[in-house]
Every structure is written in C-alpha cells, then in structure tokens.
C-alpha cells in the first residue's frame, strides 16, 4: 500500500495541479478540488499510519481506502474533466490499489466498477453541456480508456502476485 502512496498520490496531485494551473477553472471549482484533495490526502495518511493499530480491521480499512479513492477520483473527474482531458487517469488509482492485496477477480470487478463510474460521469457531463449522449467518437475514446484501466489493473495484480511468489520462493 505504501508503494501506491509513493507513486500514485504524487501523480494524482501533479495531475490535479496541472489541471488547475494550466486550465484555470473557476475559483469555486479550484477551491473545492483542493478541499477534496486535501481531505482525501489527510485521511489516507491517517489510515496508513494507523492501519497497524487496528490490525484486525486492516483488510477492511484497505477496502475502504480503495472505495474512498474511487469516490475522490469520481468527484475530481467530475469537477475538472471539462477543463483537463487527462483527468480520467485518476480512475486508475482505485483498481491499482486493490491489485496490491485483493484477488484478481476482485481487482477486475473494481476496475469494471471504476470504468462504469467514468462512463456515467461522461454521460452526465454530456447532458450538462447539452450534448445529449455525446458522440460516437467520444464514446470510443471512453471505451479505450476503460480498456486501459482494466488491463493496467490486471497487469498490476499480476505483478503483485509475481512479487509475492518470488519472495516466497526465496524463503
């Protein structure tokens, strides 16, 4: 789990900072985005520092962390995707986190759910901008993004499984 905090959290922060700095959304969107990011960051740090204190609940805490990250990704995607197209990359964080300690079928379902949330938010965004159901090209783009999310998640799960096998073979 700490690996994700070292790589994915800074990536998410950089992605959001670039989205805000280079696209300059409204002040309300900017403040709300920073508020969500700050609250999620603080909660993730607190959970990671206290996971060993609640060792019996560590499995549940990790699952909550995955769903919390997905909710934060969805909120930030909704707020900033109109300004910064790469915001969809936030949907990689929850399935990648689940790949570290969940079974492959759970990772797959997490990735599918993440994709479903992304599709839903694309649709809601399309309705909000009066574009109806978006165009075929945009749905194809979203489909490509969804396929990447699933494949990347399964790749991460396979890598995590391989690391454990190598570790166990050295004992």
What are the functions of these language-model segments?
Residues 3-82, 92-95, 114-116:
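Hydrophobic transmembrane alpha-helices and their membrane-interface boundaries in multi-pass
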Residues 17-38, 54-60, 100-165:
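Alpha-helical transmembrane segments and their interfaces in multipass membrane proteins
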Residues 83-88, 109:
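Alpha-helix N-cap/helix-start motif
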Residues 87-95, 148-152:
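Hydrophobic core segments of transmembrane alpha-helices in multi-pass, intramembrane catalytic enzymes
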Residues 167-171:
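Short, highly charged, low-complexity non-transmembrane loops/tails of multi-pass membrane proteins
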């Amino acid at each position: 789990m700490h690996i994700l905090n070292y790589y994915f959290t800074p990536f998410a922060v950089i992605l959001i900072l670039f989205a805000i700095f280079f696209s300059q959304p409204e002040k309300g969107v900017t403040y709300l985005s920073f508020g969500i990011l700050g609250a999620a960051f603080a909660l993730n740090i607190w959970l990671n520092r206290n996971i060993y204190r609640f060792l019996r609940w560590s499995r549940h805490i990790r699952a909550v962390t995955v769903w919390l990250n997905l909710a934060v990704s969805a909120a930030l995607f909704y707020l900033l995707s109109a300004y910064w197209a790469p915001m969809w990359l936030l949907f990689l964080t929850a399935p990648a986190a689940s790949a570290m300690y969940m079974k492959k079928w759970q990772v797959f379902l997490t990735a599918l759910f993440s994709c479903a949330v992304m599709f839903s938010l694309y649709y809601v965004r399309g309705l909000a901008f009066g574009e109806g159901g978006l165009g075929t090209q945009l749905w194809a783009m979203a489909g490509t993004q969804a396929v990447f999310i699933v494949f990347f998640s399964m790749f991460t799960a396979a890598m995590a499984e391989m690391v454990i096998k190598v570790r166990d073979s050295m004992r």
